[in-house]
Amino acid sequence: MQRNTVAMKRFGPLFIVVLMLLPFVCRSQTEQTPIRVAFWNMENFFDPFVDSTKTYNAFTEDGMQHWTKTRFYKKRNNMYKAILAMSENHPLGILGMCEVENEYVLSALFEQTPLKKHNYRWVLYEGPDKRGIDPAIVYSLDHFQLVESAVFPYYNPEDTTYHSRDILYAKFVAKVPEPVEGPSHIADTLHVFVNHWPSRYSGELETVGSRSCSAAILRAKVDSIIATAPEGYQPKVIMMGDLNDCPTDPSVYDVLRARHPSEMEEGCLMNLFGKNDGLGFEGTLKHQAEWQIFDQIIVTPAIMEDNVGLHYQEGSARIFHADFMLEDDETYHGKKLFRTYIGPRYFGGFSDHLPVYIDLVR
């Protein structure tokens, strides 16, 4: 009896501390840090060198935009600052990008800045865009293994002379502490599409058909993935990009059939940016006084299910808007984007779009 009393006096405080810490230890074993999946239109992310194989060389030192090495590295540093801030101390799992010229700018951003410690790799195909800018997918090797990738060309049967940017596709398997049972970790397989649909430069109504063509191509590819999936399995597909249309425009709402979760019907895709309810900011770009959401992340309903594998963390869809990416709008009031250029005028900012992201958990 005396021995037990002495033991309690000696180890009692330690025992109490262990009991107090036990809930936190158990929680850390069951909870995982969310994997952030983001998209950002980088706004003319060009290197400063002349490319003799291309006719568009505005973003060179002697070009129309006077794009010097100093300006390029300023842009590069701005972008990594924003990506680090958006990561919130954890590397992004996947970052879809558009308006990327080549692998040189990706290497400068992800291998020559503090981002290099996060073990990023990327997928980039140079396509037919007349300015030489393309979509890219950057992914963390700590989170994902690349299985395959491809591009799907833009095609409009009513105007075969018009060329636009390819849709970029990649298939990933998540790296998880404990493998999921089943072939190829099927519950942790992600199909990712990155889009940059035709712009409204020639007018919204004049170009609506072009964006509808991109929407039809994307929908056909998603339907093919769903149709060829193993029996009983619903594929997890993430579609992201600058669609140059709002969520309620015909290309997105009718052709792609992407709807806000509150408007879902059978056969529809889920647009997590379909309404600005809880997204954290007014829009992803500003036209005069009006904020719009051109940059969207759309998913198949399977990614919303939390019964097995990676799934969407409820309420995590956000428009990222650090204060340093914005400036006062003296013309239309409120805030506007702190851009690199407006026309030929150099301002030394970030982009004409804000990034968007969602979080995945397991």
Regions found by a protein language model. Give the residues of each.
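N-terminal, active-site-proximal structural segment of metallo-dependent hydrolase catalytic domains
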Residues: C26-K117, W122-I133, M325, D329-G334, ...
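Active-site His/acidic residue clusters
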Residues: T53-Y56, D188-G209
